[in-house]
Amino acid sequence: MKNMKIGKIDGSITRIGNLMFIIILISLFSCALKKNTSQKIMEESVHQTEGIIQAKNDLLVGKSKAICYSGFRTGQHPDRGDGAKNPSYEEVLEDLEILSEKLNFQLIRIYDSGENSELVLRVIEENNINIKVMLGIWLRAELSNHNTCSWLTEPIPQDELEQNKKLNLVEIEKGISLANEFKDIVVAVNVGNEALVDWNDHKVNTDTIITYVQKVKKSIYQDVTVADNYKWWADNCAELAKVVDFVSVHIYPIWEGKDINEGLSFSIENLEEVKRTIPNAKIVITEAGWPSVAYEFGERASEEKQKQYYNEFMSWTQEMNITTFWFEAFDEDWKGETNNMMGAEKHWGLYTVDRNPKEVIKAQLITN
């Protein structure tokens, strides 16, 4: 009986030993697998950045962090056919002091060469604010793309298109004039904003934009560019890329159905797509952002997710030496649907329309 017990004990020890041996083997295999997986991810990450990383001197005026600025507050708006209601001198000054002193932005983008943009430049000059500007030349529709733009329900009348061509020439002359008058503040000029994509309502022919770019380049000393969606650049850019001084791309993962867990990786894929087409072009990201509220996106839009995308993407582009204009500084409630204040177009800012900071920058304000 005693020998039988000893035999049972020996058998149990053997089984335990075998089980422990199997566990050790599984652990070793798991560690090796994790190591190989991590190494693969790192190698893929390095591979991604090898095709995208730029030289330090590719940064616009040496800045990686920049921001899009449009100062329209509640009750204010640009010209929508019945005249504009612009911010006051004091309001613009308040905004620029927030951006330069509280958030340390020293490079902003403005979208047109109208009265409001001239005011922004004058406020910077007269108050000696440490901010440089990418000036915009806004182009109106010269083609009716009512078949591809979802909110154009009927063709744009031909007489309106002809009038727009004249107004575009006037806008170009204004842009040239402002760039030359404020040559110490304006560091680049952008001709047309999302005027090349089929889905927008102010489409202009590519050859026409090339002609406009060449005209502006002959008249100013600053760099000249055209800003549009990354996909347009990846698919259609061959001729335009030859005449601009750098390529300006827009990236919005959330508009393409992505949630925050894919925000950074999808943005990198967008840039890779552009780089494959024009590998030697200097790239500036002139719009990238994440809304804090949007009925269109449901839970994909939130202040926390905006904060995460801002921190991840802006850090990554800094490492890549890519100047990135975050879209945007302040919410603008004049945009989008007038009867729905929860629309995405109204909620891209780091601040609300009332100039209250969102989660994305509260930590920065405490630090500063």
Write out the residue ranges for each language-model feature.
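C-terminal motif of bacterial Sec signal peptides marking the signal peptidase cleavage site
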Residues: 28-30
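Aromatic-rich peripheral "rim/lid" segments of glycoside hydrolase catalytic domains that contact
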Residues: 40-58, 62, 299-302, 316-368
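N-terminal carbohydrate-binding/catalytic regions of secreted carbohydrate-active enzymes
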Residues: 62-148
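Conserved, mostly hydrophobic/aromatic
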Residues: 108, 189, 247, 285-287, ...
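Substrate-binding cleft of extracellular glycoside hydrolase catalytic domains
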Residues: 119-222
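Aromatic- and acid-rich polysaccharide-binding/catalytic face
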Residues: 135-137, 146-148, 187, 193, ...
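Active-site clefts of carbohydrate-active enzymes
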Residues: 197, 201, 251-255, 277-307, ...
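Aromatic-lined carbohydrate-recognition surfaces of secreted/lumenal glycan-active proteins
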Residues: 213-235, 281-289, 323-333
